[in-house]
Amino acid sequence: MASPAFSHFLPRFGVAAAVASALSLAGCQSWNTQDTLPPTSGVQPLKGLAQNVSVRRNAVGVPLIESSSFHDALFTLGYVHASDRIGQMVTLHLLAQGRLAEMSGADALEVDRLMRAINLKKSADELYKASSPRIKRFFEVYARGVNAYLFRYRDKLPPDLAAQGYTPEYWKAEDSALIFCLLNFGQSANLQEEINALVLAQKVGSDKLPWLTPSYPDEPLPLAEADKLKGLNLTVPGLNEVSRAINRLAQLNSLGTRGGSNLAIAPQRSRTGRSLLAADSHLQAWYYTQIRAPKYQAAGASIAGLPAILQGFNGKVAWSMSSVEGDNQDLFLEKLKRQGNALYYQNNGKWQPVTVRNETYFVKGQRPIREAVYETRHGPLLNSALGAALGNGFGLALQTPELKDDKTLDAFFDLSRAQNVEKASDASREIRAIALNMVFADASNIGWQVTGRFPNRREGEGLLPSPGWDGRYDWDGYADPMLHPYDQDPPQGWIATANQRVISQGYGMQLSNSWHAPERAERMAGLASSGKQDNRSLIALQYDQSTLFAAKLKKMFEAPGMAQPLKQAIEALPDTERAKAREAYSRLLAFDGKVSAGSADAALYELFLQESAKQIFLDKLGPESSDAWQAFVANGNLSYSAQADHLLGQEDSPFWDDSRTAQKEDKPAILARSLAAAISSGEQLLGADRKAWQWGKLHSYQWTNANGRQIRGPLQAGGDHNTINSAAYRWGQDFAITDTPALRLIVDFSLSEPLMGLNSSGQSGNPVSPNYANGIDGWLKAQYLSLPMQPQNFERSYGKTRLTLVPGK
């Protein structure tokens, strides 16, 4: 599978291939690689089926499963998931358990140590045990379908997976709960940000840290939150190792991208008088599927390893999900001391022994390694797991919600069967194990529900690590689900989410302080409010590449307290730089905010953003190779950034002064330098003819296979981190695209067949499959495919060719 956003994406489906540098397809197998493809026609007996099942596929390989029982449909879903995505399933399963080194070798060991400490298996066990007998039975049947594939094809695995020499284990029902917990972990905030904040605090101190960790444009800086760290020696053993492991995990976990959006249009805003729903997700792991069985039909996006359609349409209700950026991960600094061989931590003035559990790592090509993981009352000590020799100093404990008595897995199934918005809302309220914006619609109504489990903190905001020895920062249970934000049929006639802050200041519960920037959501709101909508306008919205940040930047340039000082600062530059700054200033004032691939002004605008970050922060956080700079850039991608916050305000920030010069600089002086630097950088990268510049020549889509070989591209890309059609890059590092909306779906209730969608990465992870990376053209051209619900329309979309699965003996 390949992605339009990542030149390194395929290994995130077969992550072991990336870690182990998988062999080239040419000559790496002794058998015909076509044998690794299960048939798509004919008759195939499978032990475990009760009755015959039909599987048809559409032009891009989306399966339609037709069965006489829901159990047989789930069995077949397991078989089909494994047929197309066994590499994804195996590697994410190993990643979630902290066992990737068994397949990939020692290079994966640091991530394994981190995942063993986090211990998702404990969460998965809690979640599975709390599920109803009905759901457990569904998961068991699904697992048998996966194992039917493994039994038949374990010696004919896809070539990139087979190259690892690893024999996959048979699937267990509990493994699906583990995949769900990995998804939950990836969609949670803000562990990575807290780790990065500590790295930054080591560089600049806790007094300057608030300027680097803003929450939102209209929120005050987190000064009180940073006061928790005042006076502490923040030299934490193993911190940089934890930081690198967390960042590596983020690269490997294809369930960890939090970007996405939802939009529901009420009948009064629709041209046809019927509701519409549109959604996109930046997760690269989605797999479209359709199930038709007695008393159950649904089509939409699933994740291989999970027997569920997580967002889609069932003939009556459409539902979608995106990250709400909920903060349910807290880091605690623990005071430690060692006495002999025993390790203790301080709790409200008293020393208590840590809990110890032993973990054994089976590393490919090496002897087993046995290590201890230490835990406090808050959770596992991450730096102990990464090999830091803990003595008298700080440990880093991670606390996450417990999932005992959690009915989330039942709730997702109930949601997929809901027949109206009211029932969808009821089901969504029971989703507690994962923090999401759930948006849903039927023909006449729309709704929204925030799901999840959010801690009640006695003090603090959870944005930065807390002193674990001080009970003032402990959790007191979880927020009452009745306080979770929701809405139904709002008077404005639309609901839009794009990872922005979804609650007002002073709301009655702590949801998060790690929101994404507001511009994507603001653009969606503006488009949704402008006249009547239909499916064509929603397609245009999903491909929109206009940024509202450019207008805010212009407003800042022309503000009463900035306009004259900025012009003076430009005039004070040396002659050559002055001319460049003047040109950049005038062109940015005229820029219309359309970040199209062929735009010269868009290129200049993005160059200015990049250069301003370096001019403002690099003197204190650099060099660019330093851990501090890498942490700063990473946090800029995870939530509302200090880069944006300083451009739009923060005139009194200590970061405006360039510590490398004798004089004291202010904001106008640094902005003037940044304007000139944008032109200079553009000349180096794009040439001297500045009118011929093109944003897409700096910023492109590329597709590569598991070996790093280019499949397609580079193709010029428009957009950036603030456009609805997102094409984010590392602000302060380079213009390489980090994520885009991989999956898109639209449901138009005025149509006889309401659901249409596309998936950029293609259905299959097997490089020899015709459905490998075959979503690229449709994604580029906005060619949505219909997924019909009425049997008389199946042949038009899925054709006549079918694979008939029959009970085996």
From Swiss-Prot:
Organism expressing this protein natively: Pseudomonas fluorescens (strain ATCC BAA-477 / NRRL B-23932 / Pf-5)
Protein name: Acyl-homoserine lactone acylase QuiP
InterPro entries attached to this UniProt entry: Ntn_hydrolases_N, Pen/GL7ACA/AHL_acylase, Penicillin_amidase_A-knob, Penicillin_amidase_dom1, Penicillin_amidase_N_B-knob, S45
Gene from which the chain derives: quiP
Self-association and partners: Heterodimer of an alpha subunit and a beta subunit processed from the same precursor.
EC numbers: 3.5.1.97
Known role: Catalyzes the deacylation of acyl-homoserine lactone (AHL or acyl-HSL), releasing homoserine lactone (HSL) and the corresponding fatty acid. Possesses a specificity for the degradation of long-chain acyl-HSLs (side chains of seven or more carbons in length).
Similarity annotation: Belongs to the peptidase S45 family.
Reaction catalysed by this enzyme: an N-acyl-L-homoserine lactone + H2O = L-homoserine lactone + a carboxylate
CC annotations in GO: periplasmic space
